Amino acid sequence: MCLALCLWSACDERTPDLYSAPDGIYFNNRTSGSVWVDTTTLTFVYEPDETMYLDVPVVIQTIGRQADIDRPVNLKVWSDNAEEGVDYELLTPAVVPAHASMFSYVVRLKRTEAIKTELKSIYLEL
């Protein structure tokens, strides 16, 4: 009798809930050891003299479902002491491609005369 009650009450068929989470976006930059970082420091000191720029990929990732369309990202880029076009260039559009949940936004840092003696900072904000 106990076995019959256990078998009778053990099954409850339900449809699982679908994944749902609020949509969001964040920087997902990691070191080679998979440690999350929010700041990157680069130097031209160890680069050959003929290296005139360094391309820095900034990984941007979404939270939530992928979309069937490209989605522009409201990315703010600014600097207190670096000038776009002179000290750096923004090479890729700030757009999450259709059917993707992440992309690399590339910032090109230029080797200028000023960078030899002065620290330049560029800030990115979502």
Residue ranges and their predicted role:
Residues 53-57, 101-104, 121:
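Intrinsic-disorder/low-complexity, polar/charged segments enriched in Ser/Thr/Lys/Arg/Asp/Glu/Gln
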Residues 113-121:
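Short glycine/proline/serine/threonine-rich loop/turn segments at secondary-structure transition edges
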Residues 97-101, 105-113:
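Short, hydrophobic beta-strand segments
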Residues 78-94, 101:
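Short beta-strand and strand-turn-strand segments in soluble, beta-rich domains
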Residues 1-2:
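Sec-dependent signal peptide recognition
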Residues 124-126:
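Enriched for extracellular/lumenal, surface-exposed ectodomains of secreted and cell-surface proteins
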Residues 12-85:
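Acidic/polar, low-complexity intrinsically disordered N-terminal segments immediately downstream
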Residues 6-10:
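C-terminal motif of bacterial Sec signal peptides marking the signal peptidase cleavage site
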